[in-house]
Amino acid sequence: MKSPILVCADAESLSRRAAKRVLAALVGKPGLLLCAAAGSTPLRTYQLLARQRERHRNAFRKLRVVKLDEWGGLPLGGLGTCEQQLEKHLLGPLGVSGKRYLGFHSNPSDPEQECARIRRCLVSEGPIDLCVLGLGMNGHVAMNEPAPSLQPQAHVARLASLTLLHPMLADSKLKPTFGLTLGMAEILASREVLLLVSGANKREPLRKLMRHEITTEFPASFLWLHSNWTLLCDRAAAEGLNTE
């Protein structure tokens, strides 16, 4: 399966294109279920979406959001959590109320039961209409890490040492002890997927993705099995690559 690959001039143009696509999907389907990744790459996209709230208030009024993943063992909404970032840049600015938001608690008393709750809610609320993803340095998608096998549904994840170096955690005194993440089958069940890849530091994982080799040791490669996904990357990430 060949993916539509769009190479943008820079991170700003990538974010503008991504925001335009998310907005079009939202206007086309009020009540859309958006799966939102945290991290630095999608933040500008969310900021640009927030600028459109007044103009498209009716569409945003019914928007539903599911959090893609979360760092386990950190206080909910604490420094470095996905919850904190999404609340600041997406949920708050877009006026997404608690009734229209589904997210892992970062420090549940029973992580397995928390994942079971998310699985049940996603069955009830899903499938995901549009999933916004980033590309991990080791090829992880959400917190689905390279492994001999991948989990299909929401689960407790063992985090790779490279993942624990994520910039989101740089200012957090506490470090996560596990991950909470949607599974690959839930991600691939999305009606549409946007993969955002920005920066020269993502050049190597993008090169591996473009091999078109599907392997559990590089979870992002499973996106090649999806019939409606788009790779948006900037020139810094795509430099020297054959994106055919």
Feature map (PLM): residue ranges:
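Ligand-binding beta-strand-loop-alpha-helix segment within the catalytic cores
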Residues: 1-2, 58-132
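N-terminal glycine-/serine-/threonine-rich phosphate-binding loop
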Residues: 1-34
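Glycine-rich N-terminal segment of FAD-binding domains in flavoprotein oxidoreductases
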Residues: 28-55
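Glycine-rich beta-strand-to-loop/alpha-helix junction loops that act as flexible
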Residues: 36-41, 133-137, 198
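A glycine- and small-aliphatic-rich helix-loop capping segment at beta-alpha/alpha-beta transitions
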Residues: 48-59, 84, 146-156, 214
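A short secondary-structure junction signal
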Residues: 113-115, 142-147, 152-154, 205-209, ...
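Class I SAM-dependent methyltransferase SAM-binding "motif I" and its flanking Rossmann-like core
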Residues: 138-184
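ATP/nucleoside-binding phosphotransfer catalytic cores, i.e., glycine-rich phosphate-binding loops
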Residues: 185, 189-244
